[in-house]
């Protein structure tokens, strides 16, 4: 017996939900629950945010935000990227309810529950909706894949391991020691 396909979840449906936790995203009209991240994941978020804010204090070219914060990319795509950068030129997309449109830079930190979305459909949607640069951070491999989405959404422009200093084409003068991103507050 055929079952009727449920209608897509829209931005309006999403906004009527109670505030989290648990946290959800809408990916191509599908409601997807985001499990709570692990401690190392949160260390990476904090480290990246700290490094980006240090850069922005000296180079006030935009604002950095962290999850949970809604990014409304379309009526059926509402994401909560781990770290977000919006340039000063595009500051008008920042609202009380989240971000209305594509940020300039999105950072997704992989976790077992999100890897297929982060590396698959979300990457493609980011490219389609105008995100310029995407960093996919892999805590297991301690590596960062950098995508220049306006040029090539399928192949990373670079992959950096924990031994390098990397730069962003989007943020002139930014130099990040990759190892600094992977500092953990847990003793090993």
What are these language model-derived features?
Residues 1-188:
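Gly/Pro/Ser/Thr-rich low-complexity, intrinsically disordered segments predominantly at protein N-termini
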